[in-house]
C-alpha cells in the first residue's frame, strides 16, 4: 500500500539526485566559484545549494537534536531514520510533559543552530560567493524551521509542532513558545524585507571592488546624494531588491522631491514584477513631474509610463508618451545603447499604433526600428522585427484587403 512515507522517499530521492548534480558542478568549478565576483549565475547556484545541499545536513542535525534530548532525559533511541530530506527518531522513555515538549523542540533548535553556524563560519570568508551561500542557507533554515514546518505539522497528522503546541499538556511552555515564535517571525519578516539576506551580483571583479569601496563611502558620507543614489542603483541592478528598496525609502525620507529616487523606485518595481505595474508607472510619472532632466533618464521614465498605458489599452496616450521618450534620445549623440533603446522605442510605438489600427504610422515606426537594428548588426533583433512585420501585414490585411505593408526585405 502506498503511504505518506513512500511519497516522502520519492521526493527525497529526486532532491538527492539534484543535490548530487549540484555537488558535481561545485567540485568542478570550485576555484572559479570561490573567486570574485559574485555573479548572477553564482547567486543562483548558491541559492540552489542552500536547499539541495544544506537541507540534508540540517535534517541530520534536526534529528540529532531530538536524539540528544532523548538521551538527556534518560530515554532510549531505538531508531534513527535519515532520508536526507526527512527523518525520524524513534525513542522510548518515561517523560514528563515538559520533557516531551523539549524533545520535540530540540529538532527545530538543531536546524536553526546549524543555519546560524553556517552563516557565522562563512560571514568573514574572503569569497563573496561563500558569504552569500551562508546568508541564504541561514535564511532558508529560519523559513523552513519556523514557517514551513509548523504549517506542515498543522496540515498533516504528524510533526514536532503538534507536540510543541499541545496546550492541553504544556499550556505555559506552549504559550511562551507561541509568543517567542511569533516574535522571531516578525523579526525574520522585517530583516528579510530590509534585504539583510541579500547581496548584489556583479559582472566583473573590478565592478565588485568598486562597489565595496562605494559602500564604505556611502556609509561615511550619508548626506552625499549622488553617492547614495549610485549605491542604490547598483543594488537594484544586482537584484538586491529589498536592500535597494530599504535604502531608497530612507533616502526619500530625507529627499522627498528627488526625481532620480522616484525613477529608481519605478525601475525597482518594474524589475521585481518583470513588467511595468501601476505602481511602477506612477513612480515614473512622479519622477518626470519632479523635474527629471537627463535625456536618457527622461526616456526611461517615459518608456515605463507608456508601457503601462499600452497595457491598459490607452493607445493614444501611449503613442504620445513613447514620442516624448524618442525625442529625448534623438537629442543626444547616440551610443550603441541609445540605438538599442531607440529601436525598442520605435518598435513599441509601432505596436501602440497597430492596436489603434493606425497601420501607416505603425509601418513607419517598424521601418525605423528595423533600420536601427540592421545598423547595429543585431540579427536577433532584425529577426524579431521581421516577425512584427508579418503580424502587421496580417492585421492590415484583415482591416482592408486593399492595403499591404511589406517588410523592407520584400
Q: Predicted segment positions?
A:
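Single-residue signature of alpha-solenoid repeat helices
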Residues: 210, 244, 279-280, 318, ...
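Hydrophobic transmembrane alpha-helices and their immediate loop junctions
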Residues: 1-230, 237, 242, 273, ...
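Flexible helix-coil transition and linker loops at the boundaries of alpha-helical arrays
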Residues: 214-221, 249-254, 287-298, 328-339, ...
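Structural motif corresponding to the intra-repeat A-B loop/turn of tetratricopeptide repeats
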Residues: 238, 272-274, 312, 356, ...
Amino acid at each position: 500500500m502506498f503511504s505518506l512515507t513512500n511519497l516522502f522517499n520519492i521526493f527525497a530521492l529526486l532532491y538527492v539526485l539534484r543535490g548530487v548534480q549540484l555537488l558535481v558542478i561545485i567540485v568542478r568549478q570550485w576555484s572559479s566559484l570561490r573567486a570574485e565576483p559574485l555573479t548572477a549565475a553564482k547567486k543562483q547556484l548558491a541559492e540552489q545549494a542552500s536547499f539541495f545541499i544544506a537541507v540534508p545536513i540540517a535534517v541530520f542535525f534536526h534529528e540529532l537534536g531530538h536524539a540528544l534530548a532523548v538521551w538527556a532525559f534518560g530515554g532510549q533511541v531505538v531508531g534513527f531514520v535519515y532520508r536526507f530530506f526527512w527523518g525520524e527518531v524513534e525513542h522510548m522513555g518515561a517523560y514528563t510533559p515538559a520533557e516531551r515538549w523539549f524533545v520535540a523542540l530540540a529538532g527545530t533548535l538543531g536546524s536553526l543552530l546549524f543555519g546560524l553556524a553556517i552563516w557565522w563560519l562563512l560571514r568573514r570568508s574572503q569569497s563573496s560567493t561563500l558569504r552569500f551561500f551562508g546568508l541564504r542557507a541561514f535564511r532558508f533554515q529560519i523559513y523552513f524551521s519556523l514557517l514551513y514546518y509548523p504549517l506542515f505539522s498543522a496540515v498533516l497528522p504528524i510533526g514536532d509542532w503538534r507536540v510543541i503546541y499541545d496546550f492541553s499538556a504544556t499550556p505555559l511552555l506552549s504559550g511562551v513558545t507561541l509568543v517567542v515564535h511569533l516574535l522571531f517571525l516578525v523579526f525574520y519578516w522585517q530583516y528579510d524585507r530590509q534585504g539583510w539576506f541579500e547581496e548584489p551580483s556583479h559582472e566583473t571583479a573590478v565592478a565588485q571592488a568598486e562597489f565595496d569601496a562605494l559602500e564604505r563611502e556611502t556609509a561615511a558620507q550619508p548626506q552625499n546624494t549622488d553617492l547614495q543614489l549610485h549605491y542604490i542603483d547598483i543594488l537594484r541592478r544586482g537584484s538586491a531588491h529589498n536592500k535597494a528598496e530599504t535604502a531608497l525609502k530612507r533616502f526619500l525620507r530625507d529627499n522627498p522631491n528627488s526625481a532620480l529616487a522616484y525613477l529608481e523606485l519605478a525601475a525597482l518595481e518594474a524589475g521585481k514584477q518583470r513588467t511595468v505595474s501601476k505602481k511602477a508607472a506612477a513612480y515614473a510619472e512622479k519622477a518626470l513631474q519632479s523635474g527629471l532632466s537627463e535625456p536618457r533618464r527622461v526616456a526611461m521614465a517615459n518608456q515605463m509610463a507608456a508601457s503601462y498605458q499600452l497595457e491598459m489599452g490607452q493607445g493614444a496616450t501611449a503613442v504620445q508618451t513613447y514620442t516624448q521618450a524618442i525625442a529625448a534620445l534623438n537629442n543626444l549623440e547616440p551610443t550603441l545603447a541609445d540605438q538599442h533603446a531607440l529601436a525598442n522605442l520605435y518598435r513599441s510605438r509601432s505596436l501602440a499604433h497597430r492596436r489603434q489600427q493606425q497601420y501607416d504610422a505603425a509601418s513607419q515606426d517598424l521601418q525605423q526600428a528595423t533600420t536601427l537594428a540592421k545598423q547595429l548588426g543585431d540579427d536577433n533583433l532584425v529577426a524579431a522585427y521581421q516577425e512584427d512585420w508579418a503580424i502587421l501585414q496580417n492585421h492590415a490585411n484583415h482591416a482592408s484587403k486593399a492595403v499591404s505593408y511589406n517588410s523592407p526585405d520584400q
